[in-house]
């Protein structure tokens, strides 16, 4: 996968290219990340990349000419078929479904805004899609771009040690992930659930599914509203709810 980045701070993306899962993907040739800075397309001695907005008001906008030239350079390097994405609070909110859609692209160019944003005409002429990572404001589009890259890269074949890792992550089936445990078996008096030590793979799968359903019900109940539960899932969720209610009653009785 090729990902081009247009950013005033390309050095920030070393967090993606040099470290962790994405760093290994770059090293192994599964992911190519290249950056273009609008500053490299300025023609004044101050390398100016911001300009005043028409109509006044606080803040500045990214200057049109260097931004467009940087986007054009990224498009030329990417070749045909590259989707140009602007990271913006006004964009579609990134979720698991969106990540899967984006992962189907072989080429993407991510445009990272700064200041108060970019000229609307640049959006109309250069941008294919706008994406957001949440209903809050950041200083620029670099962190959202890194979030998008990290989430999408997990779906590139060969990036993860086991492809099942991506398939079993939270939200992969519309549910939150189940609890996980590693050594030691006992930590400050808290034991690993015995079923995970049993070696019974069918029971382990059942336990994990029940915990996943229960955790979703407790923490993100709205996710369940959009799911058509299987008969097994409905039974397991009902079991979890009964067990949770019993624990709550025991706790209240001991307080």
From Swiss-Prot:
Cellular component GO terms, alphabetical: cytosol
GO MF entries: tRNA (guanine(37)-N1)-methyltransferase activity
Catalytic activity: guanosine(37) in tRNA + S-adenosyl-L-methionine = N(1)-methylguanosine(37) in tRNA + S-adenosyl-L-homocysteine + H(+)
InterPro entries with a match to the protein in the record: Alpha/beta_knot_MTases, tRNA_m1G_MeTrfase_C_sf, tRNA_m1G_MeTrfase_TrmD, tRNA_m1G_MTases_N, tRNA_MeTrfase_TRMD/TRM10
Residue runs in coiled coils: none
Keywords linked to the UniProt accession: Cytoplasm, Methyltransferase, S-adenosyl-L-methionine, Transferase, tRNA processing
Broad class of enzyme this protein falls into: transferase
Family, similarity comment: Belongs to the RNA methyltransferase TrmD family.
Primary role: Specifically methylates guanosine-37 in various tRNAs.
Assembly, per entry: Homodimer.
Protein name (Swiss-Prot/TrEMBL): tRNA (guanine-N(1)-)-methyltransferase
Species of the source: Serratia marcescens
Lineage of the organism: Bacteria, Pseudomonadati, Pseudomonadota, Gammaproteobacteria, Enterobacterales
């Amino acid at each position: 996968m090729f990902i081009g980045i247009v950013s005033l701070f390309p050095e920030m993306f070393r967090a993606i290219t040099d470290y962790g899962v994405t760093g290994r993907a770059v090293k192994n040739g599964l992911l190519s990340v290249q950056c273009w800075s609008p500053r490299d397309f300025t023609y004044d001695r101050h390398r100016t990349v911001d300009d005043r907005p028409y109509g006044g008001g606080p803040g500045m906008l990214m200057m049109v000419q260097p931004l467009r030239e940087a986007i054009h350079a990224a498009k030329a390097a990417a070749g045909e078929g590259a989707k140009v994405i602007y990271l913006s609070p006004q964009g579609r909110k990134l979720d698991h479904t969106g990540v899967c859609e984006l992962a189907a692209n072989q080429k993407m160019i991510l445009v990272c805004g700064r200041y108060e944003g970019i000229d609307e005409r640049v959006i109309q002429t250069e941008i294919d899609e706008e994406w957001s990572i949440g209903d809050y404001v950041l200083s620029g589009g670099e962190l959202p771009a890194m979030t998008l890259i990290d989430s999408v890269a997990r779906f590139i074949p060969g990036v993860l040690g086991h492809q099942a890792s991506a398939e079993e992550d939270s939200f992969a089936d519309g549910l939150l992930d189940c609890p996980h445990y590693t050594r030691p078996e006992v930590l400050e008096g808290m034991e690993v659930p015995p079923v995970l030590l049993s070696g019974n793979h069918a029971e382990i799968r059942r336990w994990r599914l029940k915990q996943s359903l229960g955790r979703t019900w407790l923490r993100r109940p709205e996710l369940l509203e959009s799911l058509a539960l299987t008969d097994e899932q409905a039974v397991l969720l009902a079991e979890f709810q009964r067990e949770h209610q019993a624990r709550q009653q025991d706790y209240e009785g001991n307080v």
